[in-house]
Amino acid sequence: MGRRLFGTDGLRGQVNIYPMTADMALRLGLAAGTRFRNGNRRHRVVIGKDTRLSGYMFESALTAGLCAAGMDVFQVGPLPTPAISFLTRNMRADLGVVISASHNPFMDNGIKFFDRSGFKLPDDVENQMTDMVLDPDWQWDYPASEKVGRAYKIADAPGRYIVYIKSSFPADLTLDGLRVVIDCANGANYKVAPLALEELGAEVIKLGTEPNGLNINHQCGSLYPEVVAAKVRETRADIGLALDGDADRLIVVDEKGTILDGDQIMALCAQDLMAKGKLPGNMLVATVMSNMALEVFMKEHGGTLLRTAVGDRYVVEAMRQHGALLGGEQSGHLIFREYSTTGDGLLAALQILRIMRERGKPLSELAGQLQLFPQQLINVHVERKIPFAECQPVADAVAAIETELGDRGRVLLRYSGTESVCRVMVEGEHPEQVARLAEMLAETVQKHLR
């Protein structure tokens, strides 16, 4: 069947409204436990969450379903999504589960799964679980009473992740003398990220580290990088770091308070790895949303940019298929496959800090090498998600814009995989032209797809 539950980043929605309900989480736990149970041995599942109030409810429901299916559950509490991926591998678990809605506000939540290797589940496995969950007559294969699973709290999980994340930073380098502003979005990394940076010697100025269950992503974190930028200028810090609620994405601010997106950071890291001969095939993997300037930059430096559909899962899939070690998204998902199987904001931050330390230059000088093309992105709420080619006014508008831009720009329309939104993106050489065309296309989409 189709992807009726899972979007590009798992299951997501408003709490206590279908599908993000406790009974759905219970059935998902049963389905996951049934799908991944194999043989008579004990099976293990790692469950982590961010700081949303509803996380406790979903943690309990998922645990009940998984235990009923015969899985032992290891609850690690609030930790970043990449930490759950790591712990799933580290603890030799059969499955990892993350309860988070990433950058969304507290009233939303989500559930996503990792396989035993720490990778997000492929579509066909999610569809198998969907079939089980949505079939009211599904016959669950419950284990015998003595084989029901148990639940455990893993108190040292944050420490394990810190040791792992620090292992990606050269042993002969420290962050002594660096002043770092970090905004943890009142989310999953509110404890771990500042502590890891402090252990490496940085002076850390903390924002968004007082979660109360309701303030995750509220005017803070990667969606509000201007907050970090202001604090960097105020404190004369060397760098600013803005994470999202589950800490798998990163937006960076240089010492001047200039906000850098994922494309600029990917260019910096790609050039560093190519110079060291550590980027296989000189290949960088990014999505269709990445700026044209990144593609030009890679060509000028003897590399190639491979584009994928939007979603870090698709970036990772392409990286595995082509043997690439660096990939990411403009939105700040950065994947260093030598160390991790998914986007990791703290890991990415340490790689940037390493480059700053090794080169002895300020971030503004290092990252200023990529001059982005003017790009306008507009999110339009839509009621229908029909193929754009089937809506003639929209198709005509796209064709007209492509004709006007020629080979010096591009237009992209895509539906969000997690929201009722159409993303309208226009890119070109002239900012006034780009803004005008993007507004025109957004109005057409709003008029005909409402």
From Swiss-Prot:
Binds 1 Mg(2+) ion per subunit. Mg(2+) binds at S102, D244, D246, D248. GO terms for cellular component: cytosol. GO terms for molecular function: magnesium ion binding; phosphoglucosamine mutase activity; phosphomannomutase activity. It catalyses: alpha-D-glucosamine 1-phosphate = D-glucosamine 6-phosphate. The modification Phosphoserine is found at S102. GO terms for biological process: carbohydrate metabolic process; peptidoglycan biosynthetic process; UDP-N-acetylglucosamine biosynthetic process. Its EC number is 5.4.2.10. It is an enzyme of class 5 (isomerase). Its cofactor is Mg(2+). It holds the Pfam family PGM_PMM_III. Keywords: Isomerase, Magnesium, Metal-binding, Phosphoprotein. It comes from the Bacteria. The active site is at S102 (phosphoserine intermediate). Activated by phosphorylation. Catalyzes the conversion of glucosamine-6-phosphate to glucosamine-1-phosphate. Belongs to the phosphohexose mutase family. This is Phosphoglucosamine mutase. It comes from Nitratidesulfovibrio vulgaris (strain ATCC 29579 / DSM 644 / CCUG 34227 / NCIMB 8303 / VKM B-1760 / Hildenborough) (Desulfovibrio vulgaris). The lineage of its organism: Bacteria, Pseudomonadati, Thermodesulfobacteriota, Desulfovibrionia, Desulfovibrionales.
